[in-house]
């Protein structure tokens, strides 16, 4: 259930990728790259929303916070469905993201309520496996809808999926935060919790690393349709190539779930970051030598490797960032999610809007984020760990 709720985020992002150009033309986008904002504004809503639902879930319980989020998502889906210009569409997408922040944030707290350490990393990896399987089929779903209906039918499908998922959640999931563990809502408490999260070296460092990973990934997502459908002229075959790459992340998450109990979160993350950074540096030099137009098979090979490494790191970094925050799991997940998304959205928009008919901006994004992740994680791992709070 957690995986499928999380997958609604992926479905809302990826199902309309094949339709971005058509949506932009119908709604009066002034430039081709402006259509990318349909993806970016959902992430912007996610960033702002996560700062709300964590504290709310600590006060009212996990389920009421999710109910509020789904309500906003359904309103945003309806607004996007009926949009007649790009600004209205972007408003609807922002509301969708604002609503989807609830399952994205609160799910981490729900899992942390019941698991910790490698066990939590294992659960999160399996959640990510299904979460990534959805992007493998979402563009195909969107392309299939476009073959038989208008692009607005994609948003009608999202509206229906939201209603079904909300009903399943309401009927089947018990509340995981008991009444005695709930904390009264207080701005002072929120401020103290934010300070604690941001001053804890481990949580802050791994959260920044998550933001850097997401930056490169958002830049890739924003320009994937232009790269594959236009630059490589794949047309309706775009969903197939996108699915192959999405499955690389999903398979990595599955593999990580199998290996993390044996090798540990830090070791798997450390080797994945090193390997992906070296590969990115080498491929960037190769891309420059081709004028930003590498053969499709080399581009696919590189992306398969880099996304597999990112899939290994993502679940582990989430778990390691949350490890010291068990006593403030709700707001801890909120701050972690909001901070990482606020890092990724502007950087991802910059990468996507830099698309110039070559893959240089996207590969640059992966290379630069890889180097920065190495620096940040080295800073985290070489400084002695801080003592764990007695309340943890």
Q: Model-found features: residue ranges?
A:
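Extracellular/periplasmic helix-loop-helix junction of adjacent transmembrane segments
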Residues: 19-48
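Conserved MFS/SLC helix-loop-helix module at the cytosolic interface between two early adjacent transmembrane helices
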Residues: 47-87
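Structural signature of the two symmetry-related core transmembrane helices
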Residues: 64-78, 159, 268-283
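Paired small-residue
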Residues: 72-79, 87-95, 297-303
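Helix-breaking motifs and short loop linkers at transmembrane-helix boundaries and internal kinks
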Residues: 29, 61, 82-88, 99, ...
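Helix-loop-helix hairpin linking two adjacent transmembrane segments in secondary transporters
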Residues: 88, 117-118, 122-171, 177
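Juxtamembrane intracellular "pre-TM" segments in multi-pass secondary transporters
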Residues: 174-206
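Cytoplasmic helix-loop-helix junction between adjacent transmembrane helices
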Residues: 92-133
